[in-house]
């Protein structure tokens, strides 16, 4: 079954084309089901598909916990978690979906690109 590229699919494609340090990008629903994803061809998987899904689900659960504090500290815009090998960026989308981007570990150049994605996601709410 082929899918037509909707706005979220285009966003994933834009990330992979526009951020040279991006390893993986995905959009999930609020249950952690992967709706769109792309992985750079020359990149080896660090996690298995099941480990990736479990990690995405934990991230979604963490965002739900953050929402409990939003009245006091404001709505969360994005989160960056640094690991030795990668950085994982999560950005909530307007429809309850979540954008995940995994980038190479020590590449500070990507931060400006990530902020452009955050601004893009916020402007399409």
Go through each PLM region and give its residues:
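Non-catalytic interaction/Regulatory regions outside core domains
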Residues: 1-125
């Amino acid at each position: 079954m082929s899918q037509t590229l909707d706005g979220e699919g285009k966003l994933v494609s834009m990330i992979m084309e526009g951020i040279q340090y991006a390893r993986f990008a995905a959009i999930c629903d609020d249950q952690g089901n992967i709706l769109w994803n792309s992985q750079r061809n020359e990149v080896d998987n660090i996690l298995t598909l099941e480990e990736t899904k479990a990690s995405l689900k934990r991230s979604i659960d963490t965002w739900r916990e953050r929402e409990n504090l939003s009245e006091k500290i404001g709505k969360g815009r994005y989160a960056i978690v640094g690991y030795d090998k990668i950085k994982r960026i999560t950005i909530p989308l307007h429809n309850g979906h979540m954008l995940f981007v995994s980038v190479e570990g020590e590449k500070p150049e990507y931060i400006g690109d990530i902020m452009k994605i955050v601004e893009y996601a916020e402007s399409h709410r």
